[in-house]
UniProtKB/Swiss-Prot annotation:
Gene Ontology CC annotations of this record: cytosolic large ribosomal subunit
Gene Ontology biological process terms in this record: regulation of translation; translation
Domain of life of the source: Bacteria
Originating organism: Psychrobacter sp. (strain PRwf-1)
Protein family according to the UniProt entry: Belongs to the universal ribosomal protein uL1 family.
Keywords: Repressor, Ribonucleoprotein, Ribosomal protein, RNA-binding, rRNA-binding, Translation regulation, tRNA-binding
Function comment: Binds directly to 23S rRNA. The L1 stalk is quite mobile in the ribosome, and is involved in E site tRNA release. Protein L1 is also a translational repressor protein, it controls the translation of the L11 operon by binding to its mRNA.
Protein name according to UniProt: Large ribosomal subunit protein uL1
GO molecular function: rRNA binding; structural constituent of ribosome; tRNA binding
Amino acid sequence: MSKLTKRQKMIAERVESQKLYTLEEAVSILNDLPPLKFKESVDIAINLGVDPRKSDQVVRGATNLPAGTGKTKRVAVFAQGAAADAAKEAGADVVGMDDLAEQVKAGNLDFDVVIAAPDAMRVVGQLGTILGPRGLMPNPKVGTVTPNVAEAVANAKAGQATYRVDKAGIIHTTIGQVGFTVEQIQQNVQALLADIRRAKPATSKGIYIKKITLSSTMGPGIALDPLPYRVAK
């Protein structure tokens, strides 16, 4: 039997699989774990009372996180003319139209977010099979197809969580990094859940926010008490 590492021992000692933790307790556990050679993200999984097979119960959107994600995102923008100039001024890393499309087709995807002006969708639409599977396809529902590309770039750079419920009815997204304070994570969680509550489908019945789990990239999943987050604060 292999020997447990210090990290594994701490997880076994501090995380009980059947217990519901407060956010403060969960963040404390993640921050106390022995550090790895890279900066871990803090991720959240939210089980919703929806049926994603029904088109009117697909919950998706984007939330500007007050404390950011701790990661600087590379942003590509499909735009031309004044919109392209505005995107560059806002800090976009790559801006273009057909030339940018050729880069994408060649496999040059060195960016985390793709934004498009409405008149650029004729070009972007041809890239669906490349961008779609990577979660990079611009969509107006999450604010990445917009006439105000500068604002979208600023939001992405400042720290924005985009999300879409998966086939199991769960939303997964990043809300910070290990090392964030409890207050920073709390601000981000509250902002995210406020948006998710507002996006509750009218046809969703019963408990909407069923389960919340906090984790780090290589850390344990810690179940939070969902009750405090089911109503607006």
